[in-house]
Design a protein with these regions (language model features):
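FAD-binding subdomain of flavoenzyme oxidoreductases
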Residues: 125, 132-136, 140-290
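General beta-strand structural signal in soluble alpha/beta enzymes
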Residues: 24-29, 51-52, 72-76, 83, ...
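A common structural junction motif
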Residues: 20, 67-70, 135-138, 297-306
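C-terminal substrate-recognition/cap domain of FAD-linked oxidoreductases
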Residues: 35, 267-273, 277-333
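Short, conserved charged micro-motifs
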Residues: 9, 57-60, 126, 286-292
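N-terminal flexible segment immediately upstream of the FAD-binding catalytic core
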Residues: 1-67, 80-117, 143, 268, ...
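Short, structural beta-strand-to-alpha-helix junction motif
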Residues: 54, 79, 115, 122-127, ...
Length: 333
């Protein structure tokens, strides 16, 4: 059922400008194009692209858009290959407010480096840099599909398809907003960190890192990574695949939410940095690769860190141009 817009577009735009400043509310077609056009798929018109600079600003933008009866699309790095963070065509029943969160950066190390709290604009590259001096690394070291991917975007889409040992990006510890059945907005704090009672207090304290070790709950009864996947993927003779889109067992609140809720932060496990060796195995016979895969998953004491099928053309391109890409990522992130 369509929701009837409650206020005019001019009134809503005024509220959005009051929340984040006029410079961060974009309405011109040229200014909004890079936000409303997907990396590979998806493009469409929007009422505005809004770029909040704090968690509290993000909350105010969300409040205004929901109260006004508009569609909200959340976006971070806009690097996804399958859509979801941009409009897809112009056949929507209401105007769209696209909220880009890249200005809200922040990675907070907790539990001696065993875990982190990531804000909406945190990228995998920044997270890796933060953890490197601690001898730790994140679930994903780099976006498997695009450079500059965001941490929260990965959680929303259960990313990490090449990761065999760690599995999909997953956590049950998150701070998010949802629209209740009566149409009102609710902030849900399932981070396992005591930050106060009101949205304003919770978001302001989290943004500034205003919490102590005593505020962090260790035994939450929830997990901050997918500990089952390594076992599931080794069941090579099972009737069901270990990994498939929208796996219900890996959909939990923020994880796999794909834009159905609005994320403000996630709490994630980190992992000891391990030495690794990369092997390239080539064959013209698919059965050879199947045999290799089954051996790696069943005969080794631990499954491989990661694995990927690469067709010949992609390998040749990587061999020719990969060094340039490596240097670019290494120096510029």
């Amino acid at each position: 059922m369509s929701v009837v817009p409650q206020i005019s577009r001019e009134a809503l735009l005024a509220q959005l400008r009051d929340a984040v400043g006029a410079a961060h509310v974009l309405t011109d077609d040229q200014a909004t194009r890079r936000f409303r056009k997907g990396h590979r798929t998806g493009e469409g018109p929007v009422l505005a692209v809004v770029r909040p600079g704090t968690l509290l600003e993000q909350w105010k933008v969300l409040q205004a858009a929901v109260a006004a009866g508009r569609i909200v699309i959340m976006q971070a790095a806009n690097t996804g290959l399958t859509g979801g963070s941009t409009p897809d065509g112009a056949n929507y029943d209401r105007e769209i407010v696209l909220v880009n969160t890249l200005r809200i950066t922040g990675v907070q190390v907790i539990a001696g480096g065993d875990q982190v709290v990531c804000l909406p604009g945190a990228t995998l590259d920044k997270l890796e840099q933060t953890l490197a001096p601690l001898g730790r690394e994140p679930h994903s070291v780099i976006g498997s599909s695009c450079i500059g991917a965001s941490v929260l975007g990965g959680i929303c889409n259960n990313s990490g398809g090449a990761l065999v040992r760690r599995g999909p990006a997953y956590t049950e510890l998150a701070l998010y907003a949802r629209v209740k059945d009566d149409g009102t907005l609710e902030l849900v704090n399932h981070l396992g960190i005591a930050l106060g009672d009101t949205p304003e207090e919770i978001l302001t304290r989290l943004q500034s890192g205003d919490y102590a070790e005593a505020d962090i709950q260790r035994d939450t009864g929830r997990v901050a990574s997918d500990s089952r996947y390594a076992q599931d993927v080794r069941a090579v003779d099972a009737d069901t695949p270990a990994r498939f889109n929208a796996d219900p067992s890996r959909l939990f609140e923020a994880s796999g939410s794909a834009g159905k809720v609005c994320l403000f932060a996630v709490r994630l496990d980190t992992f000891p940095k391990e030495p690794s060796t990369v092997f390239y195995i080539g064959s013209n016979v698919p059965d050879d690769l199947t045999a290799v895969r089954r051996h790696l998953l069943t005969a080794l004491p631990r499954p491989p860190i990661a694995g990927e099928y690469i067709h010949r053309t992609a390998f040749d391109i990587g061999e020719k141009y990969g060094k340039d890409t490596f240097l670019l990522i290494n120096h510029f992130g």
